[in-house]
Design a protein with these regions (language model features):
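N-terminal subdomain of nucleotide-sugar transferases
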Residues: 1-56, 83
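Histidine-centered active-site/metal-ligand motif
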Residues: 33, 89-92
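Active-site proximal beta-strand in glycosyltransferases
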Residues: 3, 87, 104-114
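Structural motif
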Residues: 38, 90-91, 114
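Residue-level recognition of alpha-helix initiation/capping sites
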Residues: 12, 19, 71, 94-95
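Short, well-ordered beta-to-alpha junction loops that form the rim of enzyme active sites
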Residues: 8, 92-93
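An amphipathic, basic-hydrophobic alpha-helix
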Residues: 61-87, 95-102, 106
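Short, hinge-like loop/turn segments at secondary-structure boundaries
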Residues: 51-56, 70, 106-108
Length: 114
């Protein structure tokens, strides 16, 4: 299967959400699935794993140091139909979660929300 995960937080942030996504990604990949991660970008961070795609982000003045995704990316808009996804999974109801729901509807794909 080709599985897309949309998340408002991913590496280099360490959190329960990130750990869960990485665990699912590792196991699903081990089972032969292709897992694509769509998350916010982090300045000066370079992903080590394949199939991680980043949305532009803003660093808002908050107590936590997690950039906020700007859910607009013409590149990702073109990429999503090309990878022939089977399912979209989102981990948040807002920002990239809403983007995931919209993309699932546009591409006529099932949406999983946890």
């Amino acid at each position: 299967m080709h599985i897309a995960n949309f998340t408002n937080t991913y590496l280099p942030v360490i959190s329960g959400v990130v750990r869960s996504i990485r665990s699912f990604r590792d196991e699903l990949t081990h089972q032969g699935h292709n897992v694509f991660i769509f998350a916010q970008e982090h300045a000066d961070y370079i992903d080590q794993d394949p199939f991680i795609f980043r949305y532009p982000s803003l660093n808002l003045p908050t107590e936590i140091d997690i950039p906020t995704a700007i859910p607009i990316s013409p590149f990702i808009d073109r990429l999503l139909p090309a990878v022939k996804l089977d399912v979209i999974h989102t981990h948040h109801p807002f920002l990239l979660g809403q983007t995931a729901a919209t993309k699932a509807q546009e591409l006529n794909l099932p949406l999983v929300f946890t």
